[in-house]
């Protein structure tokens, strides 16, 4: 059960960070840094 909780926490944290960066810097020019 601990693995499930840790996985969920990791995914949610990554999602929050991704959303924060995405909304902080609106993609005006398509940057291909991550992909």
Curated annotation (Swiss-Prot):
Membrane topology label: Single-pass membrane protein
Pfam families, per the entry: PsbT
Transmembrane domains' residue ranges: 3-23
Record carries keyword Chloroplast: yes
Cellular component, GO annotation: chloroplast thylakoid membrane; photosystem II reaction center
Highest taxon, organism lineage: Eukaryota
Record keywords, A-Z: Chloroplast, Membrane, Photosynthesis, Photosystem II, Plastid, Thylakoid, Transmembrane, Transmembrane helix
One of the GO biological process terms: photosynthesis
Subcellular location: Plastid, Chloroplast thylakoid membrane
Subunit structure: PSII is composed of 1 copy each of membrane proteins PsbA, PsbB, PsbC, PsbD, PsbE, PsbF, PsbH, PsbI, PsbJ, PsbK, PsbL, PsbM, PsbT, PsbY, PsbZ, Psb30/Ycf12, at least 3 peripheral proteins of the oxygen-evolving complex and a large number of cofactors. It forms dimeric complexes.
Entry similarity comment: Belongs to the PsbT family.
General function of this protein: Found at the monomer-monomer interface of the photosystem II (PS II) dimer, plays a role in assembly and dimerization of PSII. PSII is a light-driven water plastoquinone oxidoreductase, using light energy to abstract electrons from H(2)O, generating a proton gradient subsequently used for ATP formation.
PANTHER family given in the database record: PHOTOSYSTEM II REACTION CENTER PROTEIN T, PTHR36411
Protein name: Photosystem II reaction center protein T
């Amino acid at each position: 059960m601990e693995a499930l909780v840790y996985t969920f926490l990791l995914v949610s944290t990554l999602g929050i960070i991704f959303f924060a960066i995405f909304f902080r810097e609106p993609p005006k020019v398509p940057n291909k840094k991550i992909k």
